[in-house]
Amino acid sequence: MTIKVGMISLGCSKNQVDAERLLAMLAGDGFTICNDMTECDAVIVNTCGFIEDAKKESIDTILECCAAKGEGSLKCVAVTGCLAERYREELAREIPEADVVLGIGSNGKIGEAIRKAVMGEHFTEYGEKESLSMEGERMLANEPWFAYVKVAEGCDNRCSYCAIPLIRGRFRSRPMENVIEECKELAARGVTELNLVAQDTTRYGEDIYGESRLPELINAVCEIEGVHWVRILYCYPDRVTDKLIDTIARQPKAVHYFDIPVQHASAHVLRDMNRRGDRRSITALCQKIREKIPDVVLRTTLIAGFPTESEEDFAELCKLVEEVRFDRLGCFAYSQEEDTPAAELEQIPEEVRRRRAEIIMELQMSAAFDFADRCTGRTLEVLAEGWEDGQYYGRSYMDAPDIDTRVYFTSEDEIEPGSYVPVLITDTDGYDLIGMAKAKEDTK
């Protein structure tokens, strides 16, 4: 009997890469991958365990899938990913309806586990977290023209609020030749946009080569035939060097986009977070990047309501947002994570944390709308992705998959999804851009 398996992957792009490797393992092991959950014999919930809201979403999804057992053909619910790794025995004990619970170091056992569970056995295993393989085939879980490429696993930064080192282990890079080979394989399959990811992408290579090799990796990936865009996500501010900035400025395929989660602006809050820097150093870095790459897009992530954040510290954070005017920004209310140093501190009330995060996003709205308005009149290369409400939509170099905005446009010519189209921006709709594709004769 062929077992049909579905996948629900939650959380970040790094977790999605793990899910894609799980799917490829199963397909290679004789399983049928099924997108219709009502027809699946088994479903995998690849969980996120990063912050409280993500944990709740993961648990709710597991419970929903468990409740669906008996409806249709579903016999097995398997739980993988960060929540399964972090809570191990607690998860198996508290949700006994889950038939399989695998820590990230046991992902290679997924086929064996599902076969046993479909026959009525429970399967629980937690291998060494640092044995999680970053190599192997992948079955892309998104559109076929872009992919995330995980260049490293784990993290050594030890930010005081973050549980990722507890879940994913120490930082460890992939050999450069392995990353390049994967990028070549993806390009051969028609992937034209490669998004390089890690917990700290700027640290890539330090553990293997004694120094960051991210600029060299970017140069090598940009040489691959068929690759059109190379994007770097998750840059640690202290490790954004002149060499990295100059590489992205010089390489035509490296998109002018920096994702730099700075987290805060107050020197003492950053110190309490076990991070470095202050508002001045962050502002200076952003100014330097903009001077070297005038059309660059700067994205950041902030945390509001960290335990030691005073009203003055929060005002400093607001000032950073107003001064730098990031082009893209996300702000999280601080989440108290078990077994982290920050969790032991006296906490700010949750309603205050959430309100502060809302204030940051309200401040950012002005900068984001101004940025969109400044795009009017520009011609942007847009990666067409689909059709909606009578118009095409896609992303420009300014938009990372899943997290940023869209460009909506009309066209006299038929547009194939996955193609790159020059689009004249004529208007805005909130954060999104509106435009018109240039006719083919206009682009000759």
Where are these regions (language model features)?
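Short acidic/polar active-site loop segments enriched in Thr and Asp
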Residues: T192, H228, D327, F332, ...
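Short, hinge-like loop/turn segments at secondary-structure boundaries
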Residues: I95-P96, A117-G120, S212-L214, I248-A249, ...
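Conserved, mostly hydrophobic/aromatic
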Residues: V179, L196, I232, I260, ...
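Proteins enriched for Cys/Gly/acidic motifs involved in redox and nucleic-acid/cofactor modification
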Residues: M1-Y204, K243, A254, F258, ...
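Terminal RNA-binding accessory module
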Residues: Q336, E344-K444
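Conserved SAM/AdoMet-binding glycine-rich loop
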Residues: V77-G81, R86, A188-E312, E322
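Generic beta-structure capping elements
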Residues: L10, C82, K129, G154, ...
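Conserved beta-strand core positions
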Residues: V5, A42-V43, A147, L194, ...
